[in-house]
Amino acid sequence: MTKREIEITTEDGVANAGLFGQAGGAGVILYMDAFGARAALDCMAERLAGQGYVVLVPDLFYRHAPYGPFDARTAFSAPATAMKIRGLLTATTQAMTMADSGAFLDALEREGVKGPVGTVGYCMGGARALNAAAAFPDRIRAAASFHGGNLASDAADSPYNNATRIKARVYVGSAGVDKSFPPEQSGRLAQALRAAEVDHIIENYAGMAHGWCVPDHGVYDEAGAERHWKRLTGFFAETLT
């Protein structure tokens, strides 16, 4: 499937994004992980677009471009590279991404997406996918996170704090061992979503490590990734049609 490069004007500049799929389908915003927009995420977007969706993969680090490229298998084992990535994460706040998300939604509309929109995020993108649903409750119908970190941390911008604003259905796939989303956060998120009457599922992928879904990651697990695809495509089929 052909990738089309587009530019999206935001409050802070211009974000590059990849667009996949044909006009007429429901829209999906894929929020990247900490290693940035790259071929591995393009492959994932292509697979999702093959289900009939129009998939947008924006570069969330556009304010600091050019950067990288980063090798997801080794980036955090090299101190200098790890420092660069952490700097990008710190400098790209949830509030920035939420402001950008309005522009991302508008871009999908310009590309012919008139119906419901879903979000899915990996790693740092998981929290952003859920927070986008809170920021745009009347535009986002489904939000999914896989190995998303800090979904119910003590940070003010942690998604569980925004549960009462979410109207979308929510799916969270957590890695079995993940310091960024330990069991106590899972319980806190579940409590917040249930109290807010959010239709949700939180599923633990036992034996999987943070990053298992993304094919260029060092902990990629094919069986676990295929299970993630089954859940994600089923979730969107139920919510975006």
Regions from the PLM with identified roles:
Residues 1-241:
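N-terminal cap/leader regions of alpha/beta-hydrolase-fold enzymes
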